[in-house]
Amino acid sequence: MARKGILGTKLGMTQVFDENNKVVPVTVVKAGPNVVTRIRTPERDGYSAVQLAYGEISPRKVNKPVTGQYTAAGVNPRRHLAELRLDDAEAVTEYEVGQELTAEIFADGSYVDVTGTSKGKGFAGTMKRHGFSGQGASHGAQAVHRRPGSIGGCATPARVFKGTRMAGRMGNDRVTVQNLLVHKVDAEQGVLLIKGAVPGRTGGLVMVRSAIKRGEK
């Protein structure tokens, strides 16, 4: 079975009840419809993948090189393009150019990995960015309460090691959360109810793929 995936939009979080009347927090993801615009094969490209297109956009806003890709695939231009890597060469036989993918590719109770862009927090200090404890609030501490402390020795090593955790820009990173449970698939509305939190803001683009660390349930 080829690894499945779909592009979608995060709509927000809510809560539903399971069969035991327990509250389940879920993220609602508008999944698809996606269209397959290109198929990568090991013989031609060196790897196996399918290119997925998603979202509405005015054709006037798409440049000519990208428009040519859509024309070759025989589909209307879309807002987003992404590649879904496949496990092996045989997996590409399950896809064809122009094929439409919807939320129904997943089933209730399956596990997925969700990739999105985390919310940007701007410039943040070490306490917020890395969870530092800070320094004393009293007993002679003056204007150092949220400072990081020492970042290295003076004479040895006489430099700051690469990767030292310091203040800086926080968020707006590509984040993947693995092994999230698909609580319910609403095929009529084209949405997935995924248990737990999903990276990114409401309205952000996400890629939902079958979990790589768990087999098909």
UniProtKB/Swiss-Prot annotation:
* UniProt KW Mitochondrion keyword: no
* PROSITE patterns xref list: RIBOSOMAL_L3 (PS00474)
Please indicate which superkingdom the organism of origin belongs to: Bacteria
Enumerate the Gene Ontology biological process terms.
translation
Concerning Pfam families, the annotation shows: Ribosomal_L3
What Gene3D superfamilies does the entry give?
3.30.160.810, Translation factors (2.40.30.10)
- MF-aspect GO terms: rRNA binding; structural constituent of ribosome
GO annotation, cellular component aspect: cytosolic large ribosomal subunit
Keywords, in A-Z order: Ribonucleoprotein, Ribosomal protein, RNA-binding, rRNA-binding
Cross-referenced NCBIfam families: L3_bact (TIGR03625)
Q: What does this protein do?
A: One of the primary rRNA binding proteins, it binds directly near the 3'-end of the 23S rRNA, where it nucleates assembly of the 50S subunit.
Concerning its family, UniProt says:
Belongs to the universal ribosomal protein uL3 family.
Q: Which HAMAP family match?
A: Ribosomal_uL3_B
Instruction: State whether it acts alone or in a complex, and with which partners, per the record.
Output: Part of the 50S ribosomal subunit. Forms a cluster with proteins L14 and L19.
Q: What is this protein called?
A: Large ribosomal subunit protein uL3
Q: Which gene encodes it?
A: rplC
